[in-house]
Amino acid sequence: AFAGILADADITAALAACKAEGTFKHGEFFTKIGLKGKSAADIKKVFGIIDQDKSDFVEEDELKLFLQNFSAGARALTDAETATFLKAGDSDGDGKIGVDEFAAMVKG
């Protein structure tokens, strides 16, 4: 799904680094997969993949399964990791992350 945007080796390394519960840190993950240095258009494409219900927002249930977008066998995020991730990205407090909020979080 991320072909042409992200390198498989970077994704594999990033997933390995947060394999244990409680170790997911979104900033480190975005850096490791190489997303931080990508164009706004590429970041928007990645958002579109993560936004599985195509609502133009990434909601809590989609965040919980965030890692599985990168590898079907990846773990779900814990409730605490999901809450931290949502809080970091939800700058307007509406309980979900829009594309601009996602881009700001990636670049952050």
From Swiss-Prot:
Any Pfam family hit: EF-hand_7
Binding annotation for Ca(2+) 2: D90, D92, D94, K96, E101
One term of GO molecular function: calcium ion binding
Residues covered by the EF-hand domain: 38-73, 77-108
Cellular component GO terms, alphabetical: cytoplasm
Binding of Ca(2+) 1, residues: D51, D53, S55, F57, E59, E62
Family annotation (CDD domains): EFh_parvalbumin_beta
Keyword Calcium applies: yes
Modified residues (N-acetylalanine): A1
Record key words, sorted: Acetylation, Allergen, Calcium, Metal-binding, Muscle protein, Repeat
Superkingdom field: Eukaryota
InterPro entries: EF-hand-dom_pair, EF_Hand_1_Ca_BS, EF_hand_dom, Parvalbumin
Miscellaneous information on this protein: Is regarded as an important allergen.
Family membership noted in the UniProt record: Belongs to the parvalbumin family.
PANTHER family: PARVALBUMIN, PARVALBUMIN ALPHA
UniProt function note: In muscle, parvalbumin is thought to be involved in relaxation after contraction. It binds two calcium ions.
Protein name: Parvalbumin beta 1
